[in-house]
Amino acid sequence: MRNKTLRWKTIVLCSIMFCLPKTPLAGQESSGFIHRLGMEARPQYVFPTNPFLQGENERWKPIQTSFAAHLKYSFKFRPNTCADRIYGGAYQGIGVSLTTFGDKKQLGDPFSFYVFQGARIARFSPRVSLNYEWNFGLSAGWKPYDNYYNSYNGAVGSRMNAYINAGVYINWAFSRYFDLIVGGDFTHFSNGNTKFPNAGINTAGAKIGLVYNFNRTEEDLSKSLYQPVITRFPRHISYDVVLFGSWRRKGVWVGEKQIASPNAYPVAGFNFAPMYNLGYKFRVGASLDGVYDGSANVYREDVIVEYGSSSSKREFLKPGIQHQLALGLSGRAEYVMPYFTIGVGMGANVLSRGDMRGFYQILALKIAVTRSSFLHIGYNLQNFQTPNYLMLGLGFRFHNKYPKVRH
């Protein structure tokens, strides 16, 4: 199962890297973009969210800090273009990082591969702005829980984990070629409930870095008198259809304790979402969400054995398929940027049984493959607190009237 998990996570990351264009938009010259290479240092505080991090570990010391070094390549829309005005100087690229928690024996020193995107929140001058940035990818090189060799580690259950990061920072272009960035961010590591334990690790702290701009000109740093005309956005309704699948682990309550099932359970589902396109950057709508969750309503039962034998044998039992299907309705909102769309959803299952009843929340990243198709990477949370399942799939957009943006 471990090899299967590693294989699928690698496939997902490779798919993301493949879909990120080498030349940002077909038919456009590379001179329409500023190419950048950046380095960052990120000292972080580790939130004590589980006993292992609080000090119940081999050293009996809390794990409170981490440090990460990042190397990043990106391309950016040039200032004073249509794309720059619409998307706020958006940039996107790929990065690698190395993180240490000061305890290589129990946690390892994981390295991450990720895609990222950022843009302006506010501009104070042609050289100074407040920006945001998110990172998403995979981290490897962890020392996971092992019943014999690493039994204290209740935070990390797999050698590869998702890496999610978001932050804000001040960007100062202090010369034609160099930018200084100073800000803060939040990071989350977890395996998406694909393996136990999955307490995860959360950090927050500072980021400071230097960015080299290969082909930026002095004109790019000056205020232009010319403002390109932005085409009026045609408001319309588009329709997204997503098919997804994944696998998950499940904890089953036995009395007052939760017992981890040794099995991995399949998950498959669909979303059908009519979305009203308000403008270049926002969509809102609703979604019909169907799912088959092979772990739903799994239970553990005592089997009576003959007198004098060993203790009762306990098995994890699956109910009929009608107890593992659900149909829900959710409200959706999406933030649309070049190549990437970030979506959130909140809904409730209207046709469901047992532990599938209740509210659910969705966070999703859509990565453009063609004009009307995309990769879908999402996560489903139940009742704002219980990890549910990954949503890895492919989506198609119909009646798409989103205009092409010149830059």
Positions of the model-derived regions?
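Residues on the lipid-exposed face of transmembrane beta-strands in outer-membrane beta-barrel proteins
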Residues: 39, 69-75, 115-121, 134-138, ...
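Transmembrane beta-strands of outer-membrane beta-barrel pores
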Residues: 41-47, 75, 96-102, 136-144, ...
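Outer-membrane beta-barrel "beta-signal"
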Residues: 202-223, 387-407
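Outer-envelope beta-barrel architecture signal
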Residues: 31-37, 86-92, 126-132, 176-180, ...
